[in-house]
């Protein structure tokens, strides 16, 4: 049965029966990959090169190169790096009939990120020659194909009983050393990475073990949701847009994990259809997506945090690799096509028809600490989509300071950055807990526009604390229209004489509409303005 025809109640069973790989195939794949790993560790290399360890994990996906050093090695600007952009056998999210894995080998001949960059071609050629010997020892049919990532990997296809798995062999620098627990490594590992000015995700294979742990910790049902999203990506999205530069599967994996954490509160007992529906709905909000974790690196670290904050100021969607602080996923890809297909599926896919998605925002809430000049402090948790004016309204509720008398600033290194009312926190890259400084000011004059029934516009200088009646008197003084004949509207609301302009949230450069109350006749109606 195709996914399109699966009912909501049958979705869990369909995923288990259709997408989970067979037990026999999984066991055979593990055995075969283990044989390849054993060969690489015990037979392949001469005594001067040691294999520290091998890791079976997920497939790689190309990303563009921009590093001039790498271009100098003969790689084109579109050459791909093997980066952690899929999910599969090593993480427990493999699909039935067709899946993928990386065999990452950590070699003693790479003593730094730079050496990995420089020595890769020679090592790959050596492994390719030696790997031919392994083919006769395997119970699987093995074919060695041209590498999907030229100059970065060896590509194998293992087949048995109609099921196959693609394997990439990836020689890598052992940046982490012995990984014994699921915790953050020494921050110096990431500082050294930043020092080599790598392209996004260039050395992501160095952090394979952390990427694997991040996904493998997920409960079984979440892994089935990951399988479902991957199936949608491979069998529905990609055939719809063959050849399109779509974002990598790994980005959708991370979005799915984020969705579960936020929408199901990391609970193992969740509704599969609701989770799937929520992921598709979030894909439609890709322009607002900003996702990151601080499991293995921290924004609090001076050097790493500064780099991460630069990434968080980039255009959305922003999805950061939880194990590699240089890995920003899916930039420049066709998220619009993903959103279009997600919307089509939400409207017509039987398993999510009528399903209510979880209440998940495309970016995590942030906690702001607002500091007054007298030492007062206020903590507010809001969405990054909150505008500065809305934030000022929240501050006003707590401290009683009118929004028009508040000036908020960020305090990055150097000159303070004044935050403007009409912009959102997200527009300033505030996707993380931040401290803002509040200065109380006297209401400043601002220019507003008054447009009459003839579409003629005049500019007036007012203060937010001016009343509507005071504005009417200014109109009377300039245009000769009696106050009692004026009817003013703003944002589809009639303005009452005793209220202030700030009460109606009148901003600089706002347009207020002027209508005339005619004696003994009908009142003219300005387009877009309500009747009294």
Q: Residue spans of the language-model regions?
A:
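Surface-exposed beta-strand-to-loop junctions
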Residues: 5-20, 99-111, 203-209, 234, ...
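Amphipathic alpha-helical interface elements that mediate macromolecular binding in regulatory proteins
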Residues: 27, 31-34, 38, 99-102, ...
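Long, low-complexity, Ser/Thr/Gly/Pro-rich intrinsically disordered segments that act as flexible linkers
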Residues: 1-45, 71, 132-138, 170-179, ...
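Ubiquitin system architectures
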Residues: 351-532
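Pol beta-like nucleotidyltransferase catalytic core
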Residues: 245-249, 253-364
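Short amphipathic alpha-helical segments embedded in low-complexity Lys/Glu-rich regions
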Residues: 50-70, 77-89, 122, 141-154, ...
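N-terminal regions immediately upstream of nucleotidyltransferase
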Residues: 1-99, 105-124, 146-153, 194
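Catalytic cores of NTP-dependent nucleotidyl/adenyl transfer enzymes across multiple folds
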Residues: 28-37, 41, 46, 50, ...
């Amino acid at each position: 049965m195709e996914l399109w025809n699966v009912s909501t109640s049958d979705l869990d069973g369909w995923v288990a029966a259709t997408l989970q790989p067979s037990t026999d195939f999984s066991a055979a794949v593990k055995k075969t990959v283990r044989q390849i790993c054993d060969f690489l560790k015990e037979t392949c290399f001469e005594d001067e090169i040691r294999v520290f360890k091998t890791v079976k994990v997920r497939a790689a996906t190309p990303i563009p190169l921009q590093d001039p050093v790498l271009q100098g090695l003969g790689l084109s600007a579109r050459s791909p790096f093997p980066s952690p952009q899929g999910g599969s056998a090593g993480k427990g999210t493999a699909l039935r009939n067709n899946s993928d894995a990386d065999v990452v080998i950590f070699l003693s001949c790479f003593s730094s990120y730079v050496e990995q960059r420089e020595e890769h071609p020679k090592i790959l050629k050596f492994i390719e020659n030696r790997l031919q010997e392994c083919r006769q020892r395997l119970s699987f049919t093995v074919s060695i194909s041209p590498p999907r990532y030229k100059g970065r990997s060896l590509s194998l296809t293992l087949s048995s009983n109609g099921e196959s798995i693609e394997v990439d062999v990836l020689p890598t620098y052992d940046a982490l050393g012995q990984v014994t627990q699921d915790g953050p490594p020494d921050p110096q590992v990431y500082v050294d990475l930043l020092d080599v000015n790598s392209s996004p995700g260039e050395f992501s294979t160095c952090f394979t073990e952390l990427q694997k742990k991040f996904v493998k910790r997920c409960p079984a049902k979440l892994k089935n949701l990951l399988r479902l999203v991957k199936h949608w990506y491979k069998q529905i999205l990609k055939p719809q847009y063959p050849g399109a530069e779509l974002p990598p599967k790994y980005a959708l994996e991370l979005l799915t994990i984020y969705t579960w954490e936020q929408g199901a509160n990391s609970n193992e007992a969740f509704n599969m259809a609701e989770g799937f529906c929520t992921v598709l709905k979030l894909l439609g909000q890709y322009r607002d997506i900003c996702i990151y974790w601080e499991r293995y690196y921290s924004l609090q670290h001076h050097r790493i945090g500064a780099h991460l904050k630069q990434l968080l100021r980039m255009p959305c969607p922003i999805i950061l690799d939880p194990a590699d602080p240089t890995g920003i996923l899916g930039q420049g890809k066709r998220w619009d096509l993903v959103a279009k297909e997600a919307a089509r599926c939400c409207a017509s896919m039987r398993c999510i028809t009528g399903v209510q998605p979880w209440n998940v925002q495309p970016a995590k809430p942030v906690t702001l600490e607002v500091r007054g000049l007298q030492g007062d402090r206020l903590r507010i948790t809001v969405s990054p989509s909150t505008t500065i004016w809305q934030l000022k309204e929240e501050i006003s509720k707590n401290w009683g300071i009118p929004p028009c008398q508040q000036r908020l600033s960020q305090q990055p290194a150097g000159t303070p950055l004044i935050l403007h009312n009409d912009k959102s926190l997200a527009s300033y890259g505030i996707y993380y807990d931040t401290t803002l400084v509040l200065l109380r000011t006297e209401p400043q004059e601002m220019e507003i526009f008054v447009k009459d029934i003839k579409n003629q516009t005049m500019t007036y200088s007012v203060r937010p604390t001016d009343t509507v009646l005071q504005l009417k008197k200014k109109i009377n003084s300039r245009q000769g229209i009696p106050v009692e004949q004026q009817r003013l509207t703003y944002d589809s609301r009639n303005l009452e004489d005793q209220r202030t302009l700030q009460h109606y949230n009148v901003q600089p450069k706002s347009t207020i509409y002027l209508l005339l109350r005619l004696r003994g006749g009908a009142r003219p109606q300005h387009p877009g303005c309500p009747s009294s």
